[in-house]
Amino acid sequence: MSTSSSSSDNGAGGSGGVFEAPSPSRPRRGANDVWPEPFLESLAVQVAVNASTSAGLLAAAPALANVFRVCTTWHAVSRSDHLWQLLSRQVWARTHLMHDTWRDEFIYRHRTARNFRTRTHTYFTLQFDPSDVDEPDSLSCRCLTLSDLYLAAGFADGTVRLFLLNNRLHVRTLRPPLRDRFGRFSRAVSGIVISDSRLTFATMDGDIHVAEIDGVGHTRTAYAGDIVNDGALVDFTGCGRWWVGLFAGVPGRAFHIWDCNSEETTFVGGTLTDPEAVMGWHTLTELTTSLGRLRISGNETAVACTRWRIMVIDLRNQGVIIGEDEEQRRGLIVTGFDANDEAYVRLDSRGNASVRRVNTQQTVCEFRVSGAAQRRVMGCVNRLHALMCAGGIMRVWEVERGEYLYSIRERVGEVDAIVADDRHVAVASASSTAQSIIHLWDFGAL
């Protein structure tokens, strides 16, 4: 384990600072004392939201401190846990309490974001027992997924290894039921979805498997893929209600949507991957460049990227296209694409990156990724930052204005998979032994 920090004062130290809501130096009485608490809570939330919108999410806390300084009545509202619950949801999009109080939750999210901006983190490599595999591809990681509690890694033989984030231990290995293969990589994991109590993963042959995270029961197949009629499942993701798959191999069947409660298919269609139909079949038998990426943005919107086009679809309305973004001249680097709840990052073949709104495709900011034209690039995004890895070096930009922040000190080699949320970054990279090395950076408030 190593700890890295580029600043001795990252705005997260101690228990004081902007969160203490200091009492005003000259308390004022009168009209301020009769303002009802719900009004003051609404005002504080609005001030925080306005500050985060105009100056960035880290501006919310100082703006709140100014509100709490107005008078003793306004200072008193800072003790309302209901207020901090509203603030955690509106500013940090947190609806699940991970700490003792919502005030603690808000403080933690602010300090973690500050750590991310100032390169303050701890670094680990995750360990697992490789002796239970018998194929050379079995230790090659193909995808990574993060939740609040777990990191899941999907491998080329269909295995998913689950790690607990608080102690970084490998706690469970999941394998799909045995089935005939349609090629060397037909059982490779395409994507993983982690919910509160279960883990769902899909393989390139189109199968979807479900297992309880607590270890009760075996992995079961929720959906049996039809590889002949659908092609290869090149990416898979999901949210609270939906599973979504991106297929390549058969024209007109790019998107598949399932209701994850009933496990029934609700939509099949789309032409996004039609130009990649032939290459879709090659992905089952040989290592190829990534043909497509698929992400959930918000609760019920999916964003997909191929070399030539980005498409936004509405899951509630079963695949209705609500936005398109084409790059017919230079082409896009698929592995440089990712999305958060509001925006996506696209990267063209010359290294020009842009952050665009999911709903409107409006450009938020732009930045340049050096070396993208000559080297393989793997990227991801969280709420505030875009990370791009090329040549073993991972660089970080903020996504509100496109400002370059820093490069991660640890070198990772050739990257096979990458994922980030607001606290963690995980990378799987190749090694000389053919076993993927899983790197983990933790920016949690220290």
Swiss-Prot record:
Expressed in inflorescence and floral meristems, young floral organ primordia, and later in ovule primordia. GO terms for molecular function: DNA-binding transcription factor activity. GO terms for cellular component: nucleus. The keyword Nucleus applies. Residues 1-32 are annotated as: Disordered. GO terms for biological process: cell differentiation; flower development; megasporogenesis; positive regulation of organ growth; protein catabolic process. Keywords: Developmental protein, Differentiation, Flowering, Nucleus, Repressor, Transcription, Transcription regulation. Its main location: nucleus. Residues 1-10 have a biased composition (Low complexity). It is found in: Nucleus. Transcriptional regulator involved in the specification of floral identity. Acts as A class cadastral protein by repressing the C class floral homeotic gene AGAMOUS in the external flower organs in association with APETALA2 and other repressors. Is required to maintain floral meristem identity in concert with AGAMOUS. Also interacts with APETALA2 to ensure the normal development of ovule. Mutations in the SAP gene result in the ectopic expression of AGAMOUS, leading to partial homeotic transformation of the external floral organs. Mutations affect equally ovule development and cause floral sterility. This is Transcriptional regulator STERILE APETALA. It comes from Arabidopsis thaliana. The gene is SAP.
